[in-house]
Amino acid sequence: MKHLASSIALTLLLPAVQAQQTVWGQCGGQGWSGPTSCVAGAACSTLNPYYAQCIPGATATSTTLTTTTAATTTSQTTTKPTTTGPTTSAPTVTASGNPFSGYQLYANPYYSSEVHTLAMPSLPSSLQPKASAVAEVPSFVWLDVAAKVPTMGTYLADIQAKNKAGANPPIAGIFVVYDLPDRDCAALASNGEYSIANNGVANYKAYIDAIRAQLVKYSDVHTILVIEPDSLANLVTNLNVAKCANAQSAYLECVDYALKQLNLPNVAMYLDAGHAGWLGWPANLGPAATLFAKVYTDAGSPAAVRGLATNVANYNAWSLSTCPSYTQGDPNCDEKKYINAMAPLLKEAGFDAHFIMDTSRNGVQPTKQNAWGDWCNVIGTGFGVRPSTNTGDPLQDAFVWIKPGGESDGTSNSTSPRYDAHCGYSDALQPAPEAGTWFQAYFEQLLTNANPSF
């Protein structure tokens, strides 16, 4: 918004017909002053209030990409999604031990629809079968606005129907709870819908209540949740940021509420715990363990809280024989070292935690990050190991895909209200759209560099 005046002045000088935006380019959104029409063969589709994108083969629209696509990518594909709830006689499943053992994970239909309708039409034919295979990899569904919670019910109903039809092994639902008020307090790219100053805590509790209602309705569906990426980690290292300091008590109150309300027999939860390059440093490790354990015990040590999730939307390796130069000074240069350093401190404080790791974008090691803290759309990355419980470490429950690969980390447009400088760094792929929207060039990068390959 700081460039609004200059944008208005520039608009007065523009010719009557503006240049058309190229395929995948931005064509609208809050604060956008560039082209609003697309080249032939593409249409301007509004994906969220901040971003509209020229999508090939699409028709102009002012709604978000549908999240109720019937496409499914699990091995059982004969049962269409249904919104019918379970019968009163449906048994409640109980999560105990490693919640991933004995289950296959639900392949996110929304992500599958992005790959099939956004990515594949413009890919070279040689990459299309590989992209189709990516769409079949289970990835977490992000409940990043309250409006997506009903879709959770649609997916749980679909899982329930498939399980009743004999899915073997049974399917588990996988979701990210991500809607704190004043979210992303130390950055700008993923600011959310709720403000602490505008009834944000109450709104968040209503959001959690709605999630709980879905989980109770589908009590026979085993469901795994990742709770609030970046939130608690920001309270360890970024209280010098005014927005984080102001949000501290609200974050703690909201996360506490989530852990208590979602502590259900059919649920397993993992609190987000940043990553090795954030909280693995010796100065951060102890305070982080203290905070995570306190949050866990203050919530009553909920049975459904299994442990911590690391490397969410990040790029770190699981296990390295040689630490990259950008990790210098941190003995915990990979996620295996990080969790094995963290676990004893947690246990001593009353939290016998297990871990999961996001491997969706860590296929290339070492990364091409200029600095370990560079997080936005990093160049040269590739899809990593597929979801698996074969981790080789008793602390590590599973490798999973939490970040949907191909969705942007943040915009490189410096005039955007949600622009974060990290997205303009030399090691960030540009031009990039708003956080959460489709980034075709990034998907192609991940696909081309996938390790193991597709």
UniProtKB/Swiss-Prot annotation:
Positions annotated with a glycan in the UniProt record: 413
Enzyme class: hydrolase
SMART domains according to UniProt: fCBD
Segments forming a coiled coil: none
Active-site positions on this chain: 184, 230, 409
EC number: 3.2.1.91
Localisation: Secreted
Predominant location: secreted
Molecular function per GO: cellulose 1,4-beta-cellobiosidase activity; cellulose binding
Pfam families, alphabetized: CBM_1 (PF00734), Glyco_hydro_6 (PF01341)
General function of this protein: The biological conversion of cellulose to glucose generally requires three types of hydrolytic enzymes: (1) Endoglucanases which cut internal beta-1,4-glucosidic bonds; (2) Exocellobiohydrolases that cut the disaccharide cellobiose from the non-reducing end of the cellulose polymer chain; (3) Beta-1,4-glucosidases which hydrolyze the cellobiose and other short cello-oligosaccharides to glucose.
UniProt-recorded name of the protein: Probable 1,4-beta-D-glucan cellobiohydrolase C
Region entry Catalytic, spans: 95-454
Organism, as annotated: Aspergillus fumigatus (strain ATCC MYA-4609 / CBS 101355 / FGSC A1100 / Af293)
Region ranges (Thr-rich linker): 59-94
